[in-house]
């Protein structure tokens, strides 16, 4: 009977984790460039049950040996196997701000994605789809969290002008004179990136993504005065939250039923009236 407790509890924990993930997605529905997390549930490995029985050998003095009798497999619950961002393209929203950029995917291999490159506080590179940038007091292009946006040579971008133009290939023009080009990084398998908070991603330890500019196998463009919306589907997310709640509630009722059965077994079975 205790096995039923463990199975139902595993289901409750999995649905609670799923609900937390969906709630986080919904709270970031209006965050530019946010990529929704998605989870996958997996059943624990099945257990093969067998019954130990005794069999006798007909001799002058009967001998008994233990014999296994197959009962069958039993499931032991589920768990959240994996959580990974979904890197599908978000919708474009015009803002009219010169420092707002959005990457529009055109031709990319399956599972590949491109990102803006920024410099983290420790000097390492991070990658983001949130192009809601600004200029600091020194004229450097930064994220809203103060991280420097990098060009294709991994240098900080300083704009010594109040107005500038960004071409679709990422070239930054001041008074129609090319100054630098945005650093756009290519992840051949975006699923291998590690989420780092605040809309940032990082590559595996000691690795950097390759430069996406001038790559003949891919195509994309940078849109100035636009930001990419999050790819969270609010309606579907709310429906999934309802489903997760119902599953959590069902497992909770199973535990209550087991609890009542155990109370009855402890208090009534074997009682002499």
Question: Where is each model-derived feature located?
Answer:
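Amphipathic alpha-helical polymerization modules
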Residues: 1-273
């Amino acid at each position: 009977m205790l096995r039923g407790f463990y199975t139902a509890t595993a289901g409750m924990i999995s649905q609670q984790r799923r609900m937390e993930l969906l709630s986080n997605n919904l709270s970031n529905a209006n965050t530019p460039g946010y990529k929704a997390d998605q989870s996958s549930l997996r059943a624990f490995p099945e257990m093969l049950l067998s019954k130990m029985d005794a069999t006798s050998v007909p001799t002058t003095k009967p001998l008994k040996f233990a014999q296994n009798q197959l009962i069958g497999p039993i499931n032991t619950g589920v768990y959240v196997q994996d959580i990974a961002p979904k890197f599908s393209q978000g919708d474009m929203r015009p803002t009219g701000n010169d420092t707002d950029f959005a990457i529009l995917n055109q031709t990319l291999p399956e599972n590949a994605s491109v990102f803006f490159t920024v410099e983290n506080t420790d000097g390492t590179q991070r990658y983001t789809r949130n192009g809601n940038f600004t200029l600091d007091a020194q004229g450097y292009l930064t994220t809203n969290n103060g991280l420097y946006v990098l060009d294709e040579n991994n240098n900080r971008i300083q704009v010594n002008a109040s107005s500038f133009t960004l071409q679709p290939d990422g070239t930054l023009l001041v008074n129609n004179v090319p100054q630098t080009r945005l650093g756009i990084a290519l992840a051949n398998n975006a699923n291998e990136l590690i989420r780092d908070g605040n809309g940032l991603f990082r590559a595996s330890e000691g690795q950097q993504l390759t430069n996406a500019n001038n790559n003949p196998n891919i195509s994309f463009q940078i849109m100035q005065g636009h930001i990419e919306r999050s790819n969270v589907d609010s309606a579907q997310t709310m429906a999934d939250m309802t489903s997760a709640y119902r599953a959590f509630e069902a497992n909770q009722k199973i535990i209550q039923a087991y609890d009542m059965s155990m109370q009855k077994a402890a208090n009534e079975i074997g009682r002499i009236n």
